[in-house]
């Protein structure tokens, strides 16, 4: 700023004292004298040696002077544009002011995909959403719990799709339904093919109506059947005399027998090997919503291919005004700018030193009318004139200092809702979450309709020998002649206990008696014991209370230690300790204990213990695909500080199951005080 003011003062001084050698810009020629930046060449009167001094360091910026009165408007000049001057030096930094908001910039290029963040915590369970469209068939899940469900209605058969291209040679399929007999062809009979592999054993058919057959002739003795299940011990018969063993007879001719009456259904055979996958059946009707047990978390998948860049997002909200940045480094010297407008006349500067005499130049053309000179002395005050027209707008002043921060304005009205943005690129699937709690066992879905018969497959290769077939139906042969009486045999082992008999008829009703001392709504005493009326409490009867009901929140507790039922339903007296799973008697008397457990995965064997000794056992044999239940109850006489708990006697039968929706519980209460 100080340098520019000095240059303007020198320029004005040259105009005043060197008017004889001044020419208009229109007829001015380029001078050979070089000057500092922003120094216009001009002719000088004196002659001397051309010298160029070194540019001194810029002085400190001076104080801002008062703004002068605008001078009178000059006549329009007709000057020719001068030569383009050298670029000026870098000006001082301006004052920092809050600028106006610029136009929003173009959306930036999509950034590179960032690193996967840390796994977040599991969020709260959301509300169930609306039912979505039916998705594609998924991978068969693990076998769920088989529960008897209500069969749904059979869906209509779907339309047959177009015939696909022939696939690769597959494994032998399940034999299809026999098709209709085709028309007689015209061809040479081919060679008989090799015998195919035996097909898988079909499902057991429904028992047919009893036929009326004729007894056929005895057939050849069949192969010895597989060892059957052990039957019930029969009545001991008379011992016969062992006869001599005869020679084996020759096999007779093959007899043609007639089918006899249908015998009773035989025992279930050995389950056959898993058959080949059959053709895909028609999609069944959607079943009831099940609550399946979530599977184990899968392996982390490979990183997918990089997706295409997304669409530009909507315009963001206006951010807060940033803090003015630090002064940047000096930029490169720019190109020469256009000649600026004529500045205001500056104040008279100090007279400069006399310059050296320059060379005499050629005579110039007569110049144009000079500019208006300095104003003369003040004249006599004249009469006030009429109000003139408003003058032209003055030049803008220098930017002022930054004002104080104003008060926060009132919040503006909400703007209009913007247009809906472009749908973003689908995100990448996150890592599988932790395994959730066991769900409610789902109901068994309905059996789907049979699939369409598949095309006959190509001839397969010879397979390995098959497993032995199921046991044949054992038929009773003709009774042979009684042999001679044999010697008495040794005493046999004791047979297994027989099945429990049917329940007996109910007994006659007993006579109701009212003990002496009984009063309705009050407690009574009998043989030194006090009993409490049903529905009465301690406040009415004066009898103390000791009761608890607890639930197991986690499945499969440890064996040979007390089971810790950790979820409390009622334990106001704190006689049950959930940390140890043990109930401690504080009031001597008769207690009633009951427990209800579930079995899943394996058998369950639970026992009720008193002071380290089992009082009663409960055993349940687990059936695959079902959720079994077992329960037990007992009345126990307890003294003070006696302890009662539930425990699994061994680790082999430890299938005790409990979850959020399937509860295993343990209860007890005092009903008579001794």
Swiss-Prot record:
Record bears the keyword Thylakoid: no
InterPro entries in alphabetical order: C1q_dom, Collagen, Collagen_Structural_Proteins, Tumour_necrosis_fac-like_dom
Biased composition (Pro residues): 83-92, 499-509
Biased composition (Low complexity): 191-207, 270-285, 387-402, 437-446, 455-482
Posttranslational modification: Prolines at the third position of the tripeptide repeating unit (G-X-Y) are hydroxylated in some or all of the chains.
Region (Triple-helical region): 53-512
SUBUNIT field: Homotrimer.
Name of this chain's protein: Collagen alpha-1(X) chain
Lineage: Eukaryota, Metazoa, Chordata, Craniata, Vertebrata
Chain's gene name: COL10A1
């Amino acid at each position: 700023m100080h340098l520019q003011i000095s240059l303007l003062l020198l320029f004005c001084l040259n105009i005043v004292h060197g008017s004889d050698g001044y020419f208009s810009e229109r007829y001015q020629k380029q001078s050979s004298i070089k000057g500092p930046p922003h120094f216009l060449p001009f002719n000088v009167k004196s002659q001397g040696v051309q010298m160029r001094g070194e540019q001194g360091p810029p002085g400190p910026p001076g104080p801002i002077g008062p703004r002068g009165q605008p001078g009178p408007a000059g006549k329009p000049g007709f000057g020719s544009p001068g030569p383009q001057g050298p670029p000026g030096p870098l000006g001082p930094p301006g004052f920092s002011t809050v600028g106006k908001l610029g136009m929003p910039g173009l959306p930036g290029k999509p950034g590179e995909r960032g690193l996967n963040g840390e796994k977040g915590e599991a969020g709260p369970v959301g509300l169930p959403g609306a039912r979505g469209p039916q998705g594609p068939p998924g991978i068969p899940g693990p076998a769920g719990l088989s529960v008897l469900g209500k069969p749904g209605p059979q869906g209509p058969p779907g339309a047959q799709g177009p015939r696909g291209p022939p696939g690769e040679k597959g494994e032998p399929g399940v034999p299809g339904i026999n098709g209709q007999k085709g028309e007689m062809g015209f061809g040479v009979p081919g060679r008989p093919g090799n015998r195919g592999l035996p097909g898988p054993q079909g499902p057991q058919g429904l028992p047919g109506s009893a036929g009326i057959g004729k007894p056929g002739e005895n057939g050849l003795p069949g192969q010895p059947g597989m060892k059957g299940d052990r039957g019930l011990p029969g009545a001991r018969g008379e011992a016969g005399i062992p006869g001599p063993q005869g020679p084996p007879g020759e096999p007779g001719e093959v007899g043609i027998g007639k089918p006899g009456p249908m015998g009773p259904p035989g025992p279930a055979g050995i389950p056959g090997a898993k058959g080949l996958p059959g053709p895909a059946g028609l999609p069944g009707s959607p079943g009831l919503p099940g609550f399946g047990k979530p599977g184990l978390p899968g392996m982390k998948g490979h990183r997918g291919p990089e997706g295409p860049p997304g669409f530009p997002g909507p315009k963001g909200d206006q951010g807060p005004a940033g803090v003015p940045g630090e002064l940047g480094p000096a930029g490169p010297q720019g190109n020469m700018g256009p000649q600026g407008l004529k500045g205001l006349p500056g104040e008279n500067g100090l007279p400069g030193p006399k310059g050296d005499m320059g060379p005499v130049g050629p005579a110039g053309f007569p110049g144009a009318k000079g500019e208006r000179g300095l104003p003369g002395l003040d004249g006599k005050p004249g009469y006030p004139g009429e109000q003139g027209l408003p003058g032209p707008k003055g030049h803008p002043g220098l930017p002022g200092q930054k004002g104080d921060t104003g008060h926060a304005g009132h919040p503006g009205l909400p703007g209009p809702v913007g247009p809906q943005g472009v749908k973003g690129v689908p995100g990448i699937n996150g890592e599988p979450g932790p395994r959730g709690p066991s769900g409610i066992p789902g109901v068994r879905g309905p059996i789907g309709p049979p699939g369409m018969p598949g095309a006959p497959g190509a001839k397969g290769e010879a397979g390995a020998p098959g497993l032995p077939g199921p046991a044949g139906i054992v038929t009773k042969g003709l009774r042979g002649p009684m042999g001679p009486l044999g010697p008495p045999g040794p005493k046999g082992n004791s047979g297994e206990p027989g099945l429990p008999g049917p329940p007996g008829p109910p007994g006659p009703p007993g006579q109701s008696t009212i003990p002496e001392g009984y009063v309705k709504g009050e407690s009574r005493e009998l043989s030194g014991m006090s009993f409490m009326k049903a529905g009465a409490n301690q406040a009415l009867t004066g009898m103390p209370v000791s009761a608890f009901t607890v639930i197991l929140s986690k499945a499969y507790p440890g064996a040979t230690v007390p089971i810790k039922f950790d979820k409390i339903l009622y334990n106001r007296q704190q006689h049950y300790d959930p940390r140890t799973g043990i109930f401690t008697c504080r009031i001597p008397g008769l207690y009633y204990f009951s427990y209800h457990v579930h079995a899943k995965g394996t058998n369950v064997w639970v026992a009720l213990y008193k002071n380290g000794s089992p009082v009663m056992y409960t055993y349940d044999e687990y059936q695959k695909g079902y959720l079994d239940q077992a329960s037990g109850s007992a009345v126990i006489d307890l003294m003070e500080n006696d302890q009662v708990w539930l425990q699994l006697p061994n680790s082999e039968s430890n299938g005790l199951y409990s979850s959020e929706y399937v509860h295993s519980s343990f209860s007890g209460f005092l009903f008579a005080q001794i």
